[in-house]
């Protein structure tokens, strides 16, 4: 119960827009009216600075910065941590695993632990640089790649043996492994912020076009997603996905990626910390046809996770020429508005369970 109450306080806002809280108004007090009007005129619920979006060459849309990632997660559960299951908690988990917090390791002071980690990190870097020079020299001499790999395995084994010797001499496990040396910051008390929050293309569009949250260019996002000259079927597919995403977000659902369960979206009533997703959404065109095996396969995967399969048929209400004209004119929100969503729930009928 305490965990749920703490989560309710943390995840108050379902979207990255915080409503303005106006002061109480006392009708018979003129100063109260003046203060209320002043607060109403001067207040704003817009972010002081938009969150920058990075568009990678591989088509990934990421947000960096711990505060920005936490803000998007706590205000609507947007994105997924690249090194986490959902919420970007890799940095906190790694700090806890390496015992880099202020409490430190039992029996050691924080300053001593920091100095020891810095010393081991520098030693590892020197060893690695020496081996890189040795490997380059072997390649220049024409040594086979298999022999170079064998030398590398031997070097790693020697490095591990030194760590074991250190553990045996001190009676305490080494605070830094070779694979952790590069992620520890120079101060030795934190790790490098290498985790990013990855957004779906429809999430990036929603936070750019529908909500003024991301500092991004919508044409750049679409060009990276569809290519410089997309065909009409590609445009329609993206429009259907965005229309479905916007439709469920506007109705208060928390929409997450459904790739884990072989569908397009997952629908949560509040979000992952509170309940499991109840519905899995598959976005389809009205004229899209599949055989029974396809529907049965999707339903079996979704049903195995105790979820209900929703077939969202997104229909275009205007001619294709009108959609193409709006798209080339970069009037994207008007193009998305040409689509409407119709849902159909797919359930397996079992004689033993559905008999009434």
From Swiss-Prot:
Its EC number is 4.6.1.16. Belongs to the tRNA-intron endonuclease family. It comes from Eremothecium gossypii (strain ATCC 10895 / CBS 109.51 / FGSC 9923 / NRRL Y-1056) (Yeast). It catalyses: pretRNA = a 3'-half-tRNA molecule with a 5'-OH end + a 5'-half-tRNA molecule with a 2',3'-cyclic phosphate end + an intron with a 2',3'-cyclic phosphate and a 5'-hydroxyl terminus. It is an enzyme of class 4 (lyase). This is tRNA-splicing endonuclease subunit SEN2. The gene is SEN2. Gene3D superfamilies: 3.40.1350.10. Pfam families: tRNA_int_endo. The keyword Lyase applies. CDD domains: tRNA-intron_lyase_C (cd22363). GO terms for biological process: tRNA processing; tRNA-type intron splice site recognition and cleavage. One of its GO terms (molecular function) is nucleic acid binding. Keywords: Lyase, tRNA processing. Constitutes one of the two catalytic subunit of the tRNA-splicing endonuclease complex, a complex responsible for identification and cleavage of the splice sites in pre-tRNA. It cleaves pre-tRNA at the 5'- and 3'-splice sites to release the intron. The products are an intron and two tRNA half-molecules bearing 2',3'-cyclic phosphate and 5'-OH termini. There are no conserved sequences at the splice sites, but the intron is invariably located at the same site in the gene, placing the splice sites an invariant distance from the constant structural features of the tRNA body. Heterotetramer composed of SEN2, SEN15, SEN34 and SEN54. Interacts directly with SEN54. The active site is at residues 268, 276, 307. The keyword Lyase applies. GO terms for cellular component: cytoplasm; mitochondrial outer membrane; tRNA-intron endonuclease complex.
